[in-house]
Amino acid sequence: MKQFILKEAPDAKLNISNFELQEVDLPKPEDGQVLVRNILLSIDAANRTWMQGRTYRDQVVAGDVMPSYSVAEIVESKDPEFKKGQIVTADSFWAEYSVIESRYINKCPDNISLPNLLSLFGIAGLTAYHGLFDVGEAKASDTVVVSAAAGSVGVYVGQLAKAIGCKVVGIAGGDTKCKKVVEELGFDGCIDYKNANLVRDLKTHCPEGIDLYFDNVGGTVLEAVLIRMKNRGRVVCCGAVSQYESSSPIGPRNIPGFVITKRLKLEGFIVMDFKEKHMEAITHMTKLLNEGKITIVEDITEGLQNAPKALVNLLNGKNFGKSMVRVAPDPYEQKMS
């Protein structure tokens, strides 16, 4: 079987050459483990942060098989709770097959399409939902700004905020992305950070200030937004993609100044902080989807061999919506054909 290892840790920008595709023997599960066939791999900016040091998981170092969340099919189980043929989400790897401790897999409902298990009903949608409502405490009267608005999480943050009546302004890279989030996803406006004076344009779009900022990029974008925050505004710190590949990361120069004078609340989180509330979120988002208030946006790359390219593209802002890689055919679609 094929798998990718991190061949060499990147100094700054990640390149396809940092990975190596290997041919290895099919692994065998032991008691308490399952062997899965990976179908879809989740491609996330967090994949890059795992290479920089220990976070909420061990650091990925040279020689490690590249980890990833996945949707997978159980091929062999050494745990009575799981059976061959079941579809699961898993803390898996960039590989055709993976052996995983059963505590790191979850059974999936059979009425949700597999890509949706990684997008709206997976890491992306759940991160958007819990960040917006549980951390940011969004309410209908809020003016909400979200950076990386065309990215995996941002596309859902904006739509969820619009669904409860918020004014939503996105920040994205390029005129095409900005037009898409406004015309296809219903944002009230979007600022192209590549061709903008952010402070000026945020004032134009949000003349009365910003109640809630969902930050996916950090750096100078966060710096500009803090200037336009209302007193007692909330900043949801979800990611810092602008800093992940910088040899000298740029931090906002107005912290703690504006945080103090504006009495701002900045809070970071990871999606698993709210694991016990996932079903509540999925139920709510299913209702919004059925009501036509959310559009699912997915960016699927075909083939395990293209996983490094998909991650590099994401880090360079080339994806629109939730990025993932299809490793194997969908068994549901095969049964229907």
Model-derived features with residue positions:
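C-terminal capping/lid region of NAD(P)-dependent oxidoreductase domains
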Residues: 1-4, 293-300, 308-337
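Mid-domain Rossmann-like dinucleotide-binding core that forms the NAD(H)/NADP(H) cofactor-binding site
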Residues: 119-196
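Glycine-rich phosphate-binding loop and adjacent beta-alpha segment
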Residues: 182, 220-294, 327-337
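Short amphipathic alpha-helix with an adjacent loop that forms part of the alpha/beta core around
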Residues: 197-208
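Glycine-rich beta-strand-centered segment in the early N-terminal region that forms part
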Residues: 25-43, 51-94
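A generic alpha-to-beta junction signature in SAM-dependent methyltransferases
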Residues: 138, 206, 229-230
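N-terminal Rossmann-like NAD(P) cofactor-binding module of classical short-chain dehydrogenase/reductase
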Residues: 89, 145, 191, 213-214
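NAD(P)H dinucleotide-binding glycine-rich loop of Rossmann-like/cofactor-binding domains
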Residues: 66-73, 83-148, 293
